[in-house]
Amino acid sequence: MGVFSIANQHIRFAVKLACAIVLALFIGFHFQLETPRWAVLTAAIVAAGPAFAAGGEPYSGAIRYRGMLRIIGTFIGCIAALIIIISMIRAPLLMILVCCVWAGFCTWISSLVRIENSYAWGLSGYTALIIVITIQTEPLLTPQFALERCSEIVIGIGCAILADLLFSPRSIKQEVDRELDSLLVAQYQLMQLCIKHGDSEEVDNAWGDLVRRTAALEGMRSNLNMESSRWVRANRRLKALNTLSLTLITQSCETYLIQNTRPELITDTFRELFETPVETVQDVHRQLKRMRRVIVWTGERETPVTLYSWVGAATRYLLLKRGVISNTKISATEEEILQGEPVVKVESAERHHAMVNFWRTTLSCVLGTLFWLWTGWTSGNGAMVMIAVVTSLAMRLPNPRMVCIDFIYGTLAALPLGLLYFLVIIPNTQQSMLLLCLSLAVLGFFIGIEVQKRRLGSMGALASTINIIVLDNPMTFHFSQFLDSALGQIVGCMLAFIVILLVRDKSKDRTGRVLLNQFVSAAVSAMTTNAARRKENRLPALYQQLFLLMNKFPGDLPKFRLALTMIIAHQRLRDAPIPVNEDLSVFHRQLRRTADHVISAGNDDKRRRYFGQLLDELDIYQEKLRIWEAPPQVTEPVKRLTGMLHKYQNALTDS
């Protein structure tokens, strides 16, 4: 298949995008909106954005959710713009600079919140800047301008959602059902590898793959939740299944680690059971039945705790999986599982990275302002808007440099494409709404094909082309204005790219160290006698951090193993029967305070001092456990944790 060929699976979304653009264009001109371009641009971005991210037609609900975020971001941006203008209308330069800081602040927030919700904050940052720049000549029209922008954006979003519904969006439910079955088989095969205690690299690859697949399943759950309210019960079950999948990974890896020192704990009976190969979820079901019978026969005390916990988690997984597939009413047994433990959210480890993004966005916007004022260029405001858009959207993604390059390619491609529409197509079709709609439908269709292939520059070309062609009411054709707009877009992208190159993001190592210390803090915080604290479910948050660590440091197995060991320590200590008394409770609080000091330390010297203090306190704690006659289920995990912290002290304290 050629580079520019059209695959059958790409056609439906391309038609959907073309329909969204045509609907927005028709409604914009029919209701005599002053700037129908905003409605068309919004419809195109809202529809094409999820397709570019997914690399194909987005699942049902994705476009609707993105549209809602865009509405929220636009309203926040408009309110911020009104407040800034009312407060500083007598100082125009200060007003623009405050808007630059606001754009940076929104980028900072978007770097800390969930990636799905960050779009709203990024959008609110540059919306305020667009409004402030546009009303420079007529500041008294600010409320009217903000209202018009909100109205046209809502119309564009409505058109994108309507087009999505007209062309029967794909449901992700079948994918979820298939993945649940496949994931359970993979979990069983991981436990087989761990029982065999074979090659450590093979085990690392297996559990790493399962962590990624579990994270992907959680993303599917979010999509299913956005799709329809009828999946509420399935959504509740999938939340619990996420924890169960992570529990299965943890128990399997702990089984592998236990055999490093005490291989005799895994009896021949269980070794023989796990030698049976499995291919389907039915095979796993049969094996679990056999294991439950063996556990009843041998007794819980004779069964290794990791295997006992694994079989229990796998059984609960099977029960909830059947409920997800059938979407039936939640039974009493399921409700008991679902009401289990409150999930704890962890503090972001990317605060330094977020601050770098703040400075990148703020400085690039300020640089654009200075460039505009110094040159007096009529399209300097267009360049500033493009700077704000690029930096606000690029900063929240893993590779902002490539996002900038995508925008540069897109704006360069938009120049000849926009020229064709501006000089030839639109002047010859503006008298006929049908021809005008068809001409833009063709543009949307072919770019829609390329967007699904994630072609470099396709997303930027779509937005930039619509932005520079004349879609105003009434239409006016001034070539100098068109050329200024096109060049302003290119210059804005270039300036944003230069700032991103100059303001280096060196936060990667710091983020990695903070993540590892958060794992240590989680393991230490599990040493508690507080019943409410012991019920807290930190497993999803810990694996979310592990997933971030894997993305930041691909292939760094020592870091992954250390993090996984801390997660295992946390789970084991959380279930350990720690003696309940005031002496240990006071010391638990002291340990948690010291672990928090390690995370928040401002430099390496302080961090080393607090980490050394933590190690000393753990030694004292082990002595206290001996005095209070704690059982081996408590003393052994604490000893292993202390040994790991001594071994990796430098990795956890040095920048």
UniProtKB/Swiss-Prot annotation:
Forms an efflux pump with AaeA. Could function as a metabolic relief valve, allowing to eliminate certain compounds when they accumulate to high levels in the cell. It is a multi-pass membrane protein. Belongs to the aromatic acid exporter ArAE (TC 2.A.85) family. The keyword Secreted does not apply. One of its GO terms (biological process) is carboxylic acid transport. It comes from Salmonella arizonae (strain ATCC BAA-731 / CDC346-86 / RSK2980). It is found in: Cell inner membrane. One of its GO terms (cellular component) is plasma membrane. One of its GO terms (molecular function) is transmembrane transporter activity. The lineage of its organism: Bacteria, Pseudomonadati, Pseudomonadota, Gammaproteobacteria, Enterobacterales. Pfam families: FUSC. Keywords: Cell inner membrane, Cell membrane, Membrane, Transmembrane, Transmembrane helix, Transport. NCBIfam families: PRK10631.1 (NF007916). This is p-hydroxybenzoic acid efflux pump subunit AaeB. It comes from the Bacteria. The keyword Phosphoprotein does not apply.
